[in-house]
Amino acid sequence: MKKIYLIGDCHVSRVSEHYGKNKVTPSLVDVVFWGKAAKSVWNLDFKKMYEEEELSSGKEEQLFYGDGIIPFSDIKDDGILLLWFGYVDVRTFLSRYDNADEVAKRYIKEIVNNFKNSTIVIIEPLPQFTEMILKYEGISSHYTYQQRLNQNKKFLDSLHKYAHDAGITNFIFQSEILDAVGVKELTPDMTHNKAPHPVDGLKDEYNSKILDLFIKKSLELLNDWS
């Protein structure tokens, strides 16, 4: 059975809830999800995460205790690896430190050094919401939409440069994510209300469509193998 691994921040946990519910997942493919809330590119250390068996956050809506929680050691270097990091960096840190190039360079280095046998697919970070929603709870500093868009562009420009230099050519673009959910930008009315305070997490209907996009892209790569 072909393996697809999807790792990233809390948005991976959210889309994972729709695995098995969508119509594009064939029985010959096994998808493993590892998503960690607030996981930034800057704090990625795949070797350490593997050795310490760092646990994922699990699903936001758990059907049972520990639903979706797995150690990072379950992520093997033997299939298609989709990486969906960078949202946290763009939202919270890059406007403050203005080090998008360094962050992107470290990201690619971590991938290349730790996943030599995988087919790599880099998913561009979830596009920023027009409002910095977490500011309402004091969870994060507040940066304007334009500030975050500027840092997003810097990060993506550097990310593609270093990926190209490393021979990584498979990407899922922010424009494809927006097309999948049928909008030009992400707005507060698209967020779910499952938490007691506003969160920058999309409603189920959008996460389901995003997962469909990821699976379809992965299946295209699997077809190229056969």
What are these regions (language model features)?
Residues E54-Q62, V88-K105, I139-N150:
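Surface-exposed cleft-lining segments at the edges of enzyme active sites
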Residues M132-S175, A195-S208:
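Substrate-gating cap/lid alpha-helix
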Residues M49-D74, R106:
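A Trp-anchored, charged/polar loop motif used as the substrate-binding/catalytic surface
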Residues K2-Y5, V29, D78-L82, S118-I123, ...:
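Hydrophobic beta-strand segments of well-ordered beta-sheets in folded domains
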Residues K184-S226:
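Conserved catalytic region of serine esterases and O-acyltransferases that act on ester linkages
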Residues G66-E102, L126-K135:
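Oxyanion-hole/transition-state-stabilizing segment in secreted/luminal serine hydrolases
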Residues W84-V90, V112-N150, S175-V181:
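Active-site segments of SGNH/GDSL-like serine hydrolases
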Residues M1-E53, S73-D74, L81:
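Serine-esterase "nucleophile elbow" of acetyl-processing enzymes
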